[in-house]
Regions:
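Conserved catalytic-loop aspartate of Hanks-type protein kinases
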Residues: 167
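Conserved HxN/HPN-centered segment at the entrance to the catalytic loop
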Residues: 47-57
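Conserved HRD-motif arginine in the catalytic loop of eukaryotic-like protein kinases
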Residues: 208
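ATP-binding glycine-rich loop module of kinase domains
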Residues: 3-41
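Catalytic-loop of the protein kinase fold
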Residues: 101-119
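Conserved short submotifs of the Hanks-type protein kinase catalytic core
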Residues: 61-75
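Conserved activation segment of eukaryotic-like protein kinases, specifically the C-terminal portion
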Residues: 141-155
C-alpha cells in the first residue's frame, strides 16, 4: 500500500489514505493503539449500507491495523440541509444504529456527531468506532469518561453505563444541530420535530425513546404530509386549507337538470382528483428521494392520468350499483 495522505494522527491512532500499488484502489488505513479486536471483527461481519466495509484486521506489535473502504463525500458539519433532508439523514442513522443495537451484546457507538458522518448522494455513512463498546450488563457505569462535548449523554460522564439510549441522546442533539445550526437553540424547528428532540435528549435515559426504531417511527410519521393536517409550517397549513375550501366551493353547486346522485359522484371525483395533485406536490421530496432519476413531469402526468381513469371507472361502478 502507498500512503497518499495522513488524515489524522494522535496518541491513540493514525488514520491514512492509502492506495493499492497495482489496482490503484484507494482505502482508509487505521493504526490503533487502543482497541477491541472483537468489536471490529463483529463490525466486519455486519452487512450494512451505512457502514464502511472492513477488508483487513491485523494485529502487529500491540497495534491493530485496519484496512477499510474509502468513502467519498463531505461530513455533515461541512454541509447544510433542508428539513426533509434532515429527516432522511435521521432515518438512515436510525437504521444503521438499529443494526448495531440489536446485536447480542449490542454495540454502542458513543461518538455520534457531524464530523463522524459522511453524507454523499443522499446516503449516510457512519464513521469512527474508536470509543465504541459492547454493552456490559454487569457494569453499573462507564469506567472511562469518553465522548464529544455537546453530544455525549450524561451517562458517559461516569454517572451510569452507556447503553442504546446513549446513542439516541446523541441523535437528538445531532438533529437539533442539523435543523438549527446550534446544539442549544431551537428557534426555527417545527413543534413536532422539537418534541422528538426533547424526548431523545432527556437527562434520564429511561425517559428517552426505548429504541432507535421507536425514534425512527416518530420521525417517519412526519415524512408523509397529509395536507393540511401535518404540514411543516402554519403558512403551508393555511395554504392547503384555503386550496381545499376553494376546491369545495367550485364543485359545490349542482348543474341544472343533474340528479343529486350524479352530482355527488361527479363533484367528489373532481375534488379527489385535485386533492391528489395537492398531495403529490407536498410530498414531492419524499418521492424524489426514493426515485431520484425519474423524469418527474412525465411521471406526474402518467400518475394523474391513471388516477383519472381509475377514478372514472370507480364512480361509474358506484353509479351502476346505486
Amino acid at each position: 500500500m502507498k500512503t497518499l495522505q495522513i488524515i489524522k494522527q494522535d496518541q491513540d491512532k493514525i488514520i491514512s489514505l492509502v492506495e493499492h500499488e497495482t489496482t490503484h484502489t484507494k482505502y482508509i488505513q487505521k493504526e490503533l493503539n487502543y482497541y477491541d479486536k472483537t468489536l471490529y471483527q463483529t463490525l466486519q461481519k455486519i452487512k450494512s449500507p451505512y457502514l464502511p466495509k472492513i477488508f483487513v484486521i491485523q494485529e502487529n506489535d500491540n497495534h491493530l491495523i485496519l484496512i477499510e473502504e474509502y468513502i467519498k463525500g463531505k461530513t455533515l458539519d461541512q454541509q447544510s440541509f433542508s428539513k426533509d433532508e434532515v429527516k432522511d439523514i435521521m432515518h438512515q442513522l436510525c437504521e444503521c444504529l438499529d443494526s448495531l443495537h440489536k446485536l447480542n451484546p449490542p454495540i454502542i457507538h458513543r461518538d455520534i456527531k457531524p464530523e463522524n458522518i459522511i453524507y454523499h448522494d443522499n446516503k449516510v455513512t457512519l464513521l469512527d468506532f474508536g470509543i465504541a463498546r459492547f454493552l456490559d450488563s454487569k457494569k453499573s457505569k462507564d469506567t472511562l469518561i469518553l465522548g464529544s462535548v455537546g453530544y455525549a449523554a450524561p451517562e458517559q460522564f461516569g454517572f451510569q453505563q452507556s447503553n442504546p439510549q446513549t446513542d439516541i441522546y446523541a441523535l437528538g442533539k445531532l438533529m437539533n444541530y442539523l435543523l438549527n445550526g446550534s446544539l442549544e437553540h431551537q428557534n426555527n424547528i417545527p413543534l413536532d420535530l422539537k418534541q422528538i428532540i426533547l424526548k431523545a435528549t432527556q437527562l434520564d435515559y429511561k425517559n428517552r425513546y426505548n429504541s432507535v426504531k421507536e425514534m425512527d417511527l416518530a420521525i417517519q410519521q412526519k415524512l408523509v404530509i397529509i395536507p393540511p393536517l401535518n404540514n411543516d409550517t402554519f403558512k403551508s397549513k393555511m395554504i392547503s386549507l384555503a386550496w381545499i375550501v376553494f376546491t369545495l366551493m367550485i364543485v359545490a353547486d349542482m348543474e341544472p337538470g343533474e340528479t343529486i346522485k350524479n352530482s355527488f359522484i361527479n363533484k367528489l371525483s373532481c375534488f379527489l382528483f385535485i386533492y391528489f395533485g395537492l398531495f403529490l406536490y407536498y410530498n414531492k421530496n419524499l418521492f424524489h428521494k426514493h426515485m431520484s432519476k425519474v423524469p418527474w413531469p412525465i411521471l406526474y402526468s402518467i400518475i394523474l392520468f391513471i388516477f383519472v381513469c381509475l377514478d372514472v371507472w370507480f364512480f361509474m361502478w358506484i353509479d351502476f350499483l346505486i
